[in-house]
Amino acid sequence: MASQGTKRSYEQMETDGERQNATEIRASVGKMIDGIGRFYIQMCTELKLSDYEGRLIQNSLTIERMVLSAFDERRNKYLEEHPSAGKDPKKTGGPIYKRVNGKWMRELVLYDKEEIRRIWRQANNGDDATAGLTHMMIWHSNLNDTTYQRTRALVRTGMDPRMCSLMQGSTLPRRSGAAGAAVKGVGTMVMELIRMIKRGINDRNFWRGENGRKTRIAYERMCNILKGKFQTAAQRAMMDQVRESRNPGNAEIEDLIFLARSALILRGSVAHKSCLPACVYGPAVASGYDFEKEGYSLVGIDPFKLLQNSQVYSLIRPNENPAHKSQLVWMACNSAAFEDLRVSSFIRGTKVIPRGKLSTRGVQIASNENMDTMESSTLELRSRYWAIRTRSGGNTNQQRASAGQISVQPTFSVQRNLPFDKTTIMAAFTGNAEGRTSDMRAEIIRMMEGAKPEEVSFQGRGVFELSDEKATNPIVPSFDMSNEGSYFFGDNAEEYDN
């Protein structure tokens, strides 16, 4: 079966659409953006936020989280059935920041979920507008991917922390649908499957009975999603083995870890979408821009143009560097957490530096942080060029890569060689070549051995001037091949904790 992505474009996944032509897709994505924008404007009115406060990214995150929580059916049901002290299952809220007498103040707001759902539906012509909710989830996921390194989660499932380039979308909720599945990295899918298999090993009823049947269907569906991300026959054949296993256990976990490692060189197809915070869409809609009429795409020039003309602010802690905070958010907006820094730097027009060198913590402010010393500054989210987002892993070749991250997952469709540390990766493939998947393993290892350093990915693809809306004149950048391009380079990023 061909990859899931070939059947429906992202935008169709994004809008649950049947087959549509490009104009219809652009309109339906635009409609989704309009809905988010209208909702945001209404929430700013409800919360009595000034224009500046409404453009504060921390307020945007709180408002986005409130609506996502209001529509989280499963968790809402769970909260109703398992009341915990001090948590009202019918309410949602969070910190809202306001400027009072020249100082930033934190105010905790609480709303009925029913009320939030009403405002959201009203902004979306009465629909639940699931696509818009998923869009916000992907924005949060992209921000997490940029901010945190998932070392602990990788180690817990038996994977190597240096495989972090495979972990796109690892914090996306289960309910993120087809659009969410499209942006998940190979490592994320492998981790979800391993967790599932481990539960089955520890709980003998996991695969049994009516519930077990549903579990099995979910397991096979996840296997198919992962299979669809692989681009070689041998990797797909191995996924068939994992999917068809009568009683998934340690052999399957081994196979999955093997496949994840192989994806560092034989990269999977992972979609990239520029999902922006609601505080970007709100002001654009308020200024009279009609996204549905004009059309919008998450993978073309549109997000770049929107960011060129947007003012977004962020709270800054005393010893943080505002330029570094801007880089963090720029990468999140462009879904570029695992992109080669050489490519990101060229497109952005300013040097994009590794996570470990950034003097900034995450965007969110913890409830116990002191507000007295908080400043705010403008986030610089503009770019020098734009480029088309890719949903392929690029073809394979090799290059020196770093200690902290041994491969990349390209975001932009731009000609370059893809760095990965072949000796480090291949060292993990010694021994264990027996068992039912041995012939496929041998074939995969052979392909990895054959990956050459001089090969170029995305041949002839370039970046474009922001005035070149139709992408007519590609500028193919030349990169310093000796330079090193990993973001989580020998890194000290914070861990992601739910």
Curated annotation (Swiss-Prot):
Pfam families: Flu_NP
Any one Gene Ontology molecular-function term assigned to this protein's record: RNA binding
Region (Disordered), start-end ranges: 1-21
GO cellular component, one term: helical viral capsid
Short sequence motif named Bipartite nuclear localization signal, residue ranges: 198-216
Motif (Unconventional nuclear localization signal): 1-18
Record has RNA-binding as a keyword: yes
Transmembrane portions of the chain: none
Annotated SUPFAM superfamilies: flu NP-like (SSF161003)
Listed GO biological process terms: symbiont entry into host cell; viral penetration into host nucleus
Record keywords, A-Z: Capsid protein, Helical capsid protein, Host nucleus, Host-virus interaction, Ribonucleoprotein, RNA-binding, Viral nucleoprotein, Viral penetration into host nucleus, Virion, Virus entry into host cell
Post-translational modification: Late in virus-infected cells, may be cleaved from a 56-kDa protein to a 53-kDa protein by a cellular caspase. This cleavage might be a marker for the onset of apoptosis in infected cells or have a specific function in virus host interaction.
Top-level lineage group: Viruses
Subcellular locations according to the entry: Virion; Host nucleus
Biased composition (Basic and acidic residues): 8-21
Subunit structure: Homomultimerizes to form the nucleocapsid. May bind host exportin-1/XPO1. Binds to viral genomic RNA. Protein-RNA contacts are mediated by a combination of electrostatic interactions between positively charged residues and the phosphate backbone and planar interactions between aromatic side chains and bases.
Physiological role: Encapsidates the negative strand viral RNA, protecting it from nucleases. The encapsidated genomic RNA is termed the ribonucleoprotein (RNP) and serves as template for transcription and replication. The RNP needs to be localized in the host nucleus to start an infectious cycle, but is too large to diffuse through the nuclear pore complex. NP comprises at least 2 nuclear localization signals that are responsible for the active RNP import into the nucleus through cellular importin alpha/beta pathway.
Family recorded in the similarity comment: Belongs to the influenza viruses nucleoprotein family.
HAMAP family: INFV_NCAP
Protein name as annotated: Nucleoprotein
Record organism: Influenza A virus (strain A/Singapore/1/1957 H2N2)
